[in-house]
Every structure is written in structure tokens, then in C-alpha cells.
């Protein structure tokens, strides 16, 4: 898998974005061809699909965690299906908490705390495992653009700062799909890390299905120390902003590509940088799980989702067509 940082021209158009537009048109055509030829299968349970329109972190994992806790509280049996990013998986596998990030992907390891998880690179491969587990509901993480399975309920996650970037498709921009059609079809839209009262203009037509959400710290960290922060996630800027908003003194940063698999040399370099800054290393849970027993001196900031209108979420999920009754 190609691992890229989020380039500046994905947010603000420049000559590079325009030069890449012909490739974006090819990407668009291939996506259309794929969707038109697909024959979606019906999975043997009701499906909640969580995804986004663009590349980069938009809070999908935290939404999936929130949904898992919500369904568990309602005694609804469920399985989480996640892409095996950064793993060496060859086929769909049921994940347990003993798996490493290399075996299951960073998201698979994290989500295994919340319920049964299947990590896969192909939706069709999960059917035998779903038949074994027999859940009432399947929470599918990050397969929104996959046309090969039926979705009963879709949630689109939107980052409140990046929104839809420069409006171009990959690689000229960050978009996997143009947003209007996706937002029209969505059952719910999460505007993540939104601390603003004003709704972005592009989302005002969807206010009746819009949920404002924040990514907030879920554990206590010593605020008297200095910290050197690093991450290899889709939206590192949001992580760094969360650290500052939490009140930590951040003396330096280092950004790695999304789903980066750290080497021993990376760890040694990070410890050296932290020593230069008289600081302790701090990172995300997605990064932390990749260090196994080597991470004893690295502080991890756990985060969770906080939403302003949970009643809307409950109403939409549990009442729409009574799909979970």
C-alpha cells in the first residue's frame, strides 16, 4: 500500500493539483466502471457502514468505538469489520487482543477491545466468518466506496477543519468520491472536531442528519512534563491540537505517513529527539500498539468521541426501518 502524507495542495489548489487532474479523471472513470459492474451481495446481518469521502483521518475509528459501546449497551450482538491496513494478513481473520498490529493492522488491534473484529482486505472473504459468529449487526469500518455489498445504514465522517479539501479527486485532491452524492445518500453525517457554532455551507442542507462530534482525551496524562509528540495517522494535526487543548507542553513534533510500520531505527531516533528536547515521547493509540514491549517509555493519549445530540443518533439507528429490533 502506498503511504502518503497529506500534501498542502490537497487543501489549497496549486499548479501541482491541476497537473494531476488528468489522473483524477482516470480514477473517476475507473470508480464509475467498478460501481456499474458490481453485483452487491447481501451480508447475513444488518450492516452499518462508517466511511468518508476523502483520504486522511476523519474520526472513523472513534465513531466505530462509540457505536460498539452503544450496541453493547442495547444488548445487540455485533461484529466489527475493518480493513487490515499495515498488516501482513493474506485473508480475512477474526482478531483477538493477542494479535499484533503487523498481524491484524493497528485499527484491528484497537477495536478488538470493543467486541468481535474481522480484519480483511476483501468483503467477500468475511461471509464464512460472519456465518460462524452469527451477529445481529455488522459495523463496517472504511468500506464506504466498496460497491460489492449492501449497506443498511451509512454514516459519513467529515473533518471540520479539512472538510473536502480542494474539491478534487485523488491524486489531484483528497477525495475518494465527490461529496454531494455521498452526503445525499448518508443516513447520518458526523462533523468531527467541530467546536464552532456555524455549520459549513456545504453541510447546511443536511442539518437534519448532522451530528457535531469532538475527539476528547479519555485518559489522564501528567501535565507537569514536557512532551515530544509523534504520529503516523491520517490527520496528525488534529492529534497535536488535541494535545495542546489538553494542556500539555509540546516541545516538538514528528510526522510519519499514515499506518506507518515503525522500525527500530525510528524508535531510536525518536528517543534521541525527545532527549534533545528534555521531553517524554507521546503518541496516539494507533501508533502505540505497534511498539509491543518496546513502548514502556512512550506515553499514549487515548481519545474517544463526544457528541452533542445522542438522541438523534439513537433515533436514526434504532428506529430507522426498525432494522435492529
UniProtKB/Swiss-Prot annotation:
Annotated coiled-coil segments of the chain: none
Alphabetical UniProt keywords: ATP-binding, Kinase, Lipid A biosynthesis, Lipid biosynthesis, Lipid metabolism, Nucleotide-binding, Transferase
Reaction catalyzed: a lipid A disaccharide + ATP = a lipid IVA + ADP + H(+)
SUPFAM superfamilies: P-loop containing nucleoside triphosphate hydrolases
Family matches, as InterPro entries: LpxK, P-loop_NTPase
Enzyme Commission number, as recorded: 2.7.1.130
Taxonomy, superkingdom: Bacteria
This protein's pathway: Glycolipid biosynthesis; lipid IV(A) biosynthesis; lipid IV(A) from (3R)-3-hydroxytetradecanoyl-[acyl-carrier-protein] and UDP-N-acetyl-alpha-D-glucosamine: step 6/6
GO MF terms, alphabetically ordered: ATP binding; tetraacyldisaccharide 4'-kinase activity
Annotated residues for binding of ATP: 54-61
GO BP, sorted A to Z: lipid A biosynthetic process; lipopolysaccharide core region biosynthetic process
GO cellular-component term (any): plasma membrane
Pfam families in alphabetical order: LpxK (PF02606)
Known function: Transfers the gamma-phosphate of ATP to the 4'-position of a tetraacyldisaccharide 1-phosphate intermediate (termed DS-1-P) to form tetraacyldisaccharide 1,4'-bis-phosphate (lipid IVA).
Similarity field: Belongs to the LpxK family.
Annotated protein name in UniProt: Tetraacyldisaccharide 4'-kinase
Native organism: Rickettsia montanensis
Amino acid at each position: 500500500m502506498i503511504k502518503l502524507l497529506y500534501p498542502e495542495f490537497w487543501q489549497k489548489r496549486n499548479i501541482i493539483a491541476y497537473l494531476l487532474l488528468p489522473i483524477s479523471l482516470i480514477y473517476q472513470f475507473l470508480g464509475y466502471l467498478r460501481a456499474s459492474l458490481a453485483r452487491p451481495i447481501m451480508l447475513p446481518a444488518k450492516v452499518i457502514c462508517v466511511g468518508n469521502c476523502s483520504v486522511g483521518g476523519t474520526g472513523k475509528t472513534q465513531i466505530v468505538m462509540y457505536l460498539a459501546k452503544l450496541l453493547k449497551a442495547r444488548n445487540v450482538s455485533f461484529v466489527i469489520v475493518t480493513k487490515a491496513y499495515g498488516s501482513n494478513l493474506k485473508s480475512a481473520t477474526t482478531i483477538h487482543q493477542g494479535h499484533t498490529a503487523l498481524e491484524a493492522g493497528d485499527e484491528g488491534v484497537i477495536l478488538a477491545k470493543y467486541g468481535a473484529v474481522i480484519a480483511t482486505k476483501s468483503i467477500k472473504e468475511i461471509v464464512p466468518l460472519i456465518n460462524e459468529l452469527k451477529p445481529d449487526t455488522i459495523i463496517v469500518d472504511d468500506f464506504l466506496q466498496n460497491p460489492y455489498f449492501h449497506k443498511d445504514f451509512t454514516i459519513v465522517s467529515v473533518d471540520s477543519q479539512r472538510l473536502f479539501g480542494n474539491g478534487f479527486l485523488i491524486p489531484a485532491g483528497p477525495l475518494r468520491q465527490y461529496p454531494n452524492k455521498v452526503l445525499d445518500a448518508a443516513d447520518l453525517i458526523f462533523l468531527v472536531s467541530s467546536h464552532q457554532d456555524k455549520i459549513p455551507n456545504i453541510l447546511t442542507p443536511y442539518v437534519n442528519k448532522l451530528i457535531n462530534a469532538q475527539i476528547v482525551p479519555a485518559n489522564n496524562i501528567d501535565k507537569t512534563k514536557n512532551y515530544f509528540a509523534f504520529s503516523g495517522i491520517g490527520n496528525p494535526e488534529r492529534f497535536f491540537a488535541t494535545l495542546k487543548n489538553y494542556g500539555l507542553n509540546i516541545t516538538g513534533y514528528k510526522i510519519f505517513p499514515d499506518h506507518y510500520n515503525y522500525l527500530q531505527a525510528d524508535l531510536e531516533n525518536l528517543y534521541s529527539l525527545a532527549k534533545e528536547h528534555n521531553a517524554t515521547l507521546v503518541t496516539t493509540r494507533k501508533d502505540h500498539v505497534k511498539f509491543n514491549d518496546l513502548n514502556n517509555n512512550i506515553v499514549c493519549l487515548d481519545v474517544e468521541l463526544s457528541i452533542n445530540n445522542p438522541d438523534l443518533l439513537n433515533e436514526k439507528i434504532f428506529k430507522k426501518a426498525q432494522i435492529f429490533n
